[in-house]
Regions:
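N-terminal export signals
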Residues: 5-24
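C-terminal segment of N-terminal export signals and the immediately downstream linker at the start
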Residues: 20-40
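Central antiparallel beta-sheet cores of small beta-barrel/beta-sandwich binding domains
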Residues: 23, 41-144, 207-301, 307-309
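N-terminal pre-domain segments of enzymes
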Residues: 28, 184-192
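A glycine-anchored, Pro-Gly-centered beta-turn/N-cap motif
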Residues: 37-38, 200-203
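Residue-level recognition of beta-strand termini and adjacent short loop/turns
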Residues: 69, 149-153, 234-235, 316-318
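Extended, aromatic/histidine-rich regions of cofactor-dependent oxidoreductases associated
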Residues: 151, 165-186, 317-319, 328-346
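Conserved Ser/Thr-centered positions that define the repeating blades of beta-propeller domains
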Residues: 160-163, 325-327
């Protein structure tokens, strides 16, 4: 498909990216199986966007893609050999059964403190379509991602922007993917990457204890098992964990997403709850001292603002402990509400 054909297709399809109704939830766990693995990627990118530029630059890259959330999520770690130097970025995807759409977020390795607004959409046949909004040079734009030939030997992706509410679209990036391995493996780690979370990479069995009622004076706890699979991303400047928890009543899945903010010299830690897959929670911030990690952030509980604290401790090559606590008095007192003990799988 040439650029003119693509623009015509965008204009014709702009009214909707809805998926066919009645699809079983299980079928969507297969939506991204074609992308799982390691890839060699060929890029073409417009030098300047939305200024009428016709100059394109070509470069190569690599991608590693894992399925998460039982197939209803993915992580997509990328490195690109830009003309200006290596660039790393992380894509996070999650499926929402209520709207029957996928959300896709992007974390720029150069500015990991900011997660870009998601694009949303889905697949029909051999193609995928995802729409969203962004800003460029201070002005609002519409964004369109499209996947083509997803079951072919060389799936390809393209990005287009519009600054006139979708009346006209400019394609500014294309990627062609060639598989190098069916089973994904992490991309190479950078030599200057922080090693704080190296202990967490791999497969774990987890024993959880969770307080039944928070900040209510409760002493009743639920105990259940779970698993974690954690991967390094962003050249070691980030990591992502896929969690399954056998919570009484209904299993819980979620993704822990972490990135090192070099400018502020601390880690950011986000949580994507599989029960609310359209949003990524506000981050905790913190770091490690003397083998103990402490992270703090803000949250809401029963309509009131609270503070949250997470502590990583008891770290050995085969075990670790994670504890979460909440404070309703500005951090003067803390109530521990969740304790997870990790044991590395053989």
């Amino acid at each position: 498909m040439d650029r003119r054909q693509f623009l015509a297709t965008l204009a014709a399809a702009a009214a909707s990216t809805a998926l066919p109704s009645g699809w079983a939830l299980a079928s969507h766990s297969e939506d991204w199986t074609w992308l799982q693995g390691n890839w060699r990627v060929r890029h073409q990118r417009l030098k300047e966007r939305l200024v009428g530029d016709t100059r394109w630059e070509s470069f190569t890259g690599s991608s590693a893609v894992w399925l998460t959330l039982g197939g209803l999520g993915t992580i997509d770690d990328n490195v690109m050999a830009l003309p200006s130097g290596p660039y790393r970025g992380l894509g996070v995807r999650a499926f929402d059964p209520v709207s029957s759409t996928w959300s896709i977020w992007w974390i720029d390795g150069r500015n990991p403190a900011h997660i870009e607004a998601p694009v949303r959409g889905g697949f029909e046949g051999d193609a995928g379509s995802f729409r969203g909004t962004d800003r460029i040079d201070g002005r609002p734009i519409d964004v369109w991602f499209r996947w083509h030939d997803i079951h072919g030997e060389e799936p390809w992706w393209e990005q287009a922007f519009s600054d006139d509410a979708g009346a006209h679209w400019e394609v500014n990036w294309r990627n062609w993917f060639r598989r190098t391995a069916a089973a994904p493996s992490p991309l190479p780690k950078l030599p200057d990457a922080p090693g704080d979370f190296d202990f967490l990479v791999g497969h774990w069995n987890v024993r959880h204890r969770r307080l039944r009622a928070r900040l209510a004076g409760s002493d009743a706890w639920d105990t259940f098992n779970g698993t974690l699979h954690n991967w390094p991303v962003l050249g070691g400047f980030g990591n992502v964990g896929d969690n399954l928890m056998d919570v009484p009543g209904a299993p819980l899945r979620g993704m822990g997403i972490r990135a090192w903010n070099a400018a502020e010299q601390h880690w950011l830690s986000w949580w994507l709850d599989g029960r609310e897959p359209t949003r990524i929670g506000a981050p905790l911030r913190g770091g490690f001292q003397a083998g103990v990690g402490r992270f703090f952030g803000e949250d809401q509980h029963d309509g009131r603002s609270i503070q949250t604290r997470v502590i990583w401790s008891r770290i050995t090559p085969r075990s670790a402990r994670w504890e979460q606590a909440a404070s309703a008095d500005g951090g003067r007192s803390w109530e521990t509400n969740w304790v997870s003990d990790f044991e590395r799988q053989a």
